[in-house]
Amino acid sequence: MEEKQYTLSKAERLCSKKLIERLFAGGNKSFPAFPLRVVYMPLGIEDEGAEVSILVSVPKKRFKRAVKRNLVKRQVREAYRRNKYILLDALRQSENPKRMALAFIWLDSRLHSGDEVEHKMKKLLYHIAEEKLQ
């Protein structure tokens, strides 16, 4: 049995300005699970990087203080890191393997517990995995 990797490497973070622009340019799929929204886009095999690249965004409009924005980003990254196997397993089992770019956007103006964020993250990842298999 293969042991799961619970890490979030630099390669898994979406840093490319071109990819970020393509992700938010429109026509890509989006799904909310309050307090999160995910925007995702399939990438071709020719694109470099990890199987799934993520971006976490917490608007300054929602949290004025950087300390709180950083706390929320940390919670979202941690929830993804602990549950990314849901999406990775679905991508590996699909007949035409591809890469994906994901952006997690925080929608609420208040903090939530780590457990609640993780529950919503699972909901989002299962939704993307189901849609990917179809």
Language model region names:
Residues 1-134:
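Positively charged, solvent-exposed patches that mediate nucleic-acid binding
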